[in-house]
Swiss-Prot record:
Name of the gene this protein is made from: rpsP
Short name of one Pfam family: Ribosomal_S16
Coiled coil: none
The protein, known as: Small ribosomal subunit protein bS16
Organism per entry: Rhizobium leguminosarum bv. trifolii (strain WSM2304)
InterPro entries the record matches: Ribosomal_bS16 (IPR000307), Ribosomal_bS16_dom_sf (IPR023803)
Record GO biological process: translation
Stretches for region Disordered: 85-123
Cytoplasm as UniProt keyword: no
C-alpha cells in the first residue's frame, strides 16, 4: 500500500481549510485516511502561528516507514525543519522557444547590418 502525506480539503465555499492527512495514494482527495497529521488554514496571515500546524513526531514516523509527502506538504515540512526539500533546477525552462531564438538572431543580424551600413556611410 503506497502511502501519501497530503492535503484533504475542508471548509466551505471560498473559505478553504485543509487537513494534512496520511492516506492511501489510491483513495480520493477527501476520502478515507489513516491518520490526521495537522492542518493548514490559508485564510490566516502568513506569519500567524496557527496557519500551519503539524504533528512533527508522527510525520517523521510515517516518512521513516515509507510515506511520501506531496509537493505542497513537503514545502510545509521544509519550513518546519521536519524534512528537506530539494530545490528544483530547470535551466532549460528559462530559455525562449526555438522560434523566439530564431527571431532574436534575425533581429541581432539586422542591427549588426545597420551598424555596418552606418559605419560605411560615415567614411
Amino acid at each position: 500500500m503506497a502511502l501519501k502525506i497530503r492535503l484533504a480539503r475542508g471548509g466551505s465555499k471560498k473559505r478553504p481549510y485543509y487537513h494534512v492527512v496520511l492516506a492511501d495514494a489510491r483513495s480520493p482527495r477527501d476520502g478515507r485516511f489513516l491518520e490526521n497529521l495537522g492542518s493548514w488554514n490559508p485564510m490566516l496571515a502568513k506569519d500567524d502561528e496557527k496557519r500551519v500546524q503539524l504533528n512533527a513526531e508522527r510525520i517523521k514516523h510515517w516518512i521513516e516507514n515509507g510515506a511520501q509527502p506531496t509537493d505542497r506538504v513537503l514545502r510545509f515540512l521544509d519550513e518546519a525543519g521536519v524534512a528537506k526539500r530539494e530545490a528544483k533546477n530547470n535551466p532549460v525552462k528559462a530559455k525562449p522557444g526555438k522560434r523566439a531564438q530564431e527571431r532574436a538572431a534575425e533581429k541581432a543580424q539586422k542591427v549588426a547590418d545597420a551598424a555596418a551600413a552606418a559605419a560605411d556611410a560615415a567614411e
